[in-house]
Each structure stands twice: as structure tokens, then as C-alpha cells.
Regions:
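Short, charged, surface-exposed loops that flank catalytic or proteolytic processing sites
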Residues: 95-101
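Short, well-ordered beta-strand elements within core beta-sheets of diverse protein domains
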Residues: 89-95
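Soluble extracytoplasmic regions of secretory-pathway and membrane proteins
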Residues: 3-8, 133-135, 271, 278-294, ...
């Protein structure tokens, strides 16, 4: 399994299917629109004879990819490189069947055409293996890129969150580690690593050194995932709090139990609840315990720099997913993406089989520029954004609906796949129709239920009252803890004079 949360205010959670295709000899494809400044492609590369079918970020062979950007050192960027990480991920899915093939596609193209983007961590999974590949550019005018790829051991969980995570790595174990020839020498040439200093070479130290901000907003997320997957390790918060001498977190750990898709959904839903960094606590959470902090993440006050906590669950998520790639099932059934739009905390993860041949309207219509009740992305945004106004009261109702839907879908999964397997034995087209109808219908049904939930919440929580559905409106006011803060800050502002005996009735 791999996961992804695409967190950016300009990301719309629409899906597309790219059909498999055969291509003519000599066919070229345009590449290299990496930034808004790239009005035209930076270059062209040859097309291959055949490209595989791709649904979102999973292809017909159950190969799945995801990413997080860590940027790295600006000096490593190469504006002459023509390939960016987004294009390279697409090309991996179109041209590779396994994770190792995907790494060869990625690094081969980088070697030939140059990497022109910022530092990236990329998760790659097939039915047998999971890898993390990290890459930076080779500097202005440089060739290729600088990269390392590490296989995550079976039975372990790894996490990366906008910060390079690969430290030391084995140089003579190609079954578990691959790297570019310049992975160390480039850092030495730039003065970012001194082999005579007596310290081992660590990729993240050379190419994306930790800063107080990175530790706070990136490594806290890593710590939170690993500590919840393996609480027995009792991982310390010292590193992400920037305490001297604290060591970085391991790239991967053995979880205390085997993780199910539902367990992984839970790992993606986090505001550090129950820790010293719980975002539902404190004056910054407001009267109703909201864990959401509007950007920017950092600010200065009286010359001192501060930073909000940055959790996995955040308001600007465009979409997220959890994939399953299973060798014991035929590809159309074994490849499954549990897909959700908007904030991970309030989304519903819905099953999309890689064998489906049509998309639900709710995930393939609309845009960022115009609201639509037909779009799942907009409907889920309505619910999440409105629930922010009285988080402690509304979000439990949202999560009750979420649990109801996801529990039902997880319970149905074995029977659905058993039926699909039986159909595959006699009629592959009927199997495809069955999986498509199942996935599409549940997306549309859930979107309709979420529209109803939006209407219900807006009716019940209105104008500061809570409506009980029987023409009665309850005054709920503010929590006592919040009222005490108000009085502490302005003790005389709201105090009423004591009643005089003559005024008492």
C-alpha cells in the first residue's frame, strides 16, 4: 500500500483515465512545462511503442506512485533540465509494469534529458515491492540528476512529508538500493559533504539539510505516523522540536500490527490529537477546538519567528488516496485506489478498481473556478468548510457518516472481489462492467449522501443555535474554558454590577 495527500490550494480533485495505446515509430511527445513561466514545452522526447492504461496514479499492472516535494538546495536546481517530477511520474506509469522498471524509466529519462525540477520524494509500489526514490537536480548546466532509491523492507511502514528522508544507504546491495553515480561526488564538489570529516554520507543532510521550520512542519508529521503505527517504540518528539542532539526518525519501522486499509485511513487523519501538540487545544483552536490554521505557516512577531503546527489533515488537500496492489489477484481486481477528495479528516475513501473503464461524474466534472453540486470535490468542501465554524459540535457528526460509509465499503470488499473473480473466469468484459458499476455507483451515492449531510448541518447549526428538528432552537453558547479565557483577557469588559437588594424581586 502507498498513500498520497495532494495538498495545495490550486488542486482540484478530478480524475482521468488514460487509455492504453500503440504509437508509431518516430512519434514524439512534448515535455517540460514545469512552471507558469514555461509558456511552451522545454523539449520533446521519443514516444515508446506502447503505453499502459492509467487511472489516476495507478496503471493497469497495479503499479502506483505518489510524491511529496522537499525542494532541497536551490543551487542543485537545473533550469536547463527539461523533465519535471509530475511528467516523470506519468511516464513511469505509462511505460513500466513494476517498481524496478519504473525506477529505470525515471532515472533513464533523467540521465538523458536532465531533471529540471526541485527536490522530490517519490513512493513507488507494485504487487511485490515498495520503494522511495529521492532526487535533486545536478545544478545549472549539469547533466542528469542526483538520486537514490531505497526498497522498504517487507512488513515495514515508511513516511515522507515534504522533507528528504533517506539518510545512509547501502552502496553494494542492488536488490534493496539503487543510486546515481554522482550521489556523493556532487555534494563533495559543492562543499555540502566532506568525506574526511569522519561522518557518514547521508542524502538528506547533503541535499536537504534540516532547519527549525522543516523539523516542525515536516518531521512532526513523520513522527506522528510512525508513533501511531508503532506505539511500542515510544518515539520521542525531541527531533521535530529541534532539541540539540536529537536524532532523525528512522526511514521505516515495523508496525505493532499488520495494517489494514482502514488502519491506514486512520493514519492519514491526524491533528496530533492526544499529544502535547494537539491542535484542538489552546487559544489558537478558538472556542470550538478547531485544528485548522490559515496560511502562512510561519510568521514573525517582535523579531521572533513562529510556526503553526502542520498536520496530515489540512484544509487545502485537493485529493488523497490509499492504494492496494495485490499479486494474488488479477490486475483489474487487485489494483485498487481508495480515493477521497478534500481534507483527509472529513473525506470518505471510496474504492476505484484499476480495471474500471469509466469514471463517475462526481469525480470527473467541474473546476476550481465554479461551484457545482455535481462535483464531489465541491460537495465535500461545503461540508468541511462549514464544519470548521463549530468544529467540536459538527465534525463528530461528519465522522459518524464517514465511518458508516467506509465500514460498509470495507465489509463489502471481499464479496465484491470474489464475484469479480468468478466473472473473470468466464467473461472479462462483464467483470469490467461489474467493477465499473460498483465503483461509480458508490461514488455517486456517497456524493448524494454528502449533499444531504451539508443540508442537514446547515439546517441544524444556524445562527449560533442548534435546531432539534421540532421547532426548538437550543442556545449552546461557548465552552466554559473559552469563557474563562475571555474573562481573563478582559475582566471588566463583560462583568455586570452586582444587584442591589432593592433591585431584587
Amino acid at each position: 500500500m502507498i498513500t498520497y495527500a495532494c495538498d495545495a490550494p490550486g488542486v482540484y480533485g478530478a480524475l482521468a483515465i488514460q487509455p492504453a495505446a500503440d504509437h508509431k515509430p518516430g512519434e514524439m511527445i512534448e515535455v517540460g512545462r514545469l512552471t507558469e513561466k514555461d509558456a511552451s514545452p522545454r523539449g520533446k522526447i521519443p514516444q515508446v511503442a506502447h503505453t499502459y492504461r492509467v487511472l489516476g496514479l495507478m496503471n493497469e499492472h497495479q503499479l502506483a506512485v505518489s510524491e511529496s516535494t522537499f525542494e532541497g538546495r536551490p543551487e542543485a536546481e537545473n533550469p536547463q533540465g527539461i523533465l519535471g517530477y509530475g511528467e516523470l511520474m506519468s511516464l513511469m506509469l505509462q511505460r513500466a509494469r513494476t517498481a524496478r522498471e519504473a525506477i529505470r524509466v525515471f532515472t533513464g529519462l533523467v540521465s538523458q534529458y536532465g531533471y529540471g525540477d526541485v527536490g522530490e520524494s517519490i513512493s513507488i509500489a507494485d504487487t511485490r515491492e515498495a520503494w522511495i526514490l529521492e532526487i535533486v537536480g545536478s545544478g545549472r548546466g549539469g547533466k542528469g540528476g542526483v538520486w537514490v532509491a531505497v526498497r522498504i523492507p517487507d512488513g515495514q511502514i515508511a513516511c515522507h512529508a515534504n522533507q528528504s528522508r533517506i539518510g545512509e544507504f547501502p552502496r553494494s546491495d542492488p536488490e534493496n538500493c539503487l543510486y546515481s553515480e554522482n550521489v556523493e561526488s556532487f555534494a563533495v564538489s559543492k562543499g555540502w559533504y566532506d568525506p574526511k570529516a569522519g561522518r557518514p554520507f547521508r542524502f538528506f543532510e547533503a541535499y536537504s539539510p534540516a532547519t527549525p521550520v522543516k523539523r516542525r512542519v515536516c518531521d512532526t508529521r513523520v513522527w506522528s505516523v510512525l508513533r501511531r503505527a508503532a506505539p511500542s517504540l515510544r518515539l520521542s518528539p525531541d527531533y521535530h522540536r529541534g532539541r540539540p542532539g536529537a536524532q532523525p526518525y528512522p526511514l521505516s519501522v515495523v508496525p505493532d500490527k499488520k495494517l489494514s486499509p482502514g488502519d491506514v485511513f486512520a493514519l492519514l487523519r491526524d491533528h496530533y490529537e492526544g499529544t502535547d501538540f494537539d491542535m484542538t487545544k489552546g487559544v489558537d483552536a478558538g472556542p470550538f477546538g478547531s485544528p485548522y490554521r490559515w496560511r502562512p505557516l510561519t510568521w514573525k512577531l517582535d523579531g521572533v519567528q513562529y510556526a503553526w503546527e502542520r498536520p496530515f489533515s489540512t484544509q487545502q488537500t485537493g485529493f488523497s488516496f490509499v492504494t492496494q496492489s495485490r499479486a494474488w489477484l488479477p490486475n483489474p481486481i487487485g489494483g485498487l485506489a481508495w480515493y477521497g477528495v478534500d481534507d483527509t479528516y472529513t473525506t470518505c475513501y471510496l474504492p476505484l478498481y484499476c480495471g474500471m473503464d469509466a469514471l463517475p461524474k462526481a469525480l470527473s466534472t467541474g473546476s476550481l473556478n465554479k461551484f457545482s453540486w455535481d462535483s464531489a470535490w465541491w460537495v465535500f468542501n461545503v461540508v468541511s468548510n462549514y464544519s470548521h465554524t463549530k468544529y467540536s459540535q459538527m465534525v463528530p457528526e461528519v465522522q459518524a457518516a464517514q465511518k458508516n460509509i467506509e465500514s460498509e465499503l470495507l465489509a463489502l470488499q471481499p464479496a465484491v472481489e470474489k464475484t469479480a473473480l468468478e466473472l473473470a473466469k468466464t467473461d472479462a468484459k462483464l467483470m469490467t462492467s461489474y467493477l465499473t458499476d460498483y465503483s461509480v455507483s458508490h461514488v455517486e451515492q456517497t456524493t448524494a449522501r454528502w449533499r444531504t449531510l451539508a443540508e442537514y448541518l446547515f439546517t441544524k447549526y444556524r445562527d449560533g443555535y442548534v435546531y432539534n428538528g421540532k421547532s426548538e432552537w437550543k442556545e449552546v453558547g461557548y465552552p466554559e474554558a473559552w469563557l474563562r479565557r475571555v474573562v481573563h483577557e478582559r475582566p471588566e469588559q463583560f462583568r455586570l454590577p452586582a444587584e442591589k437588594p432593592s433591585e431584587k424581586k
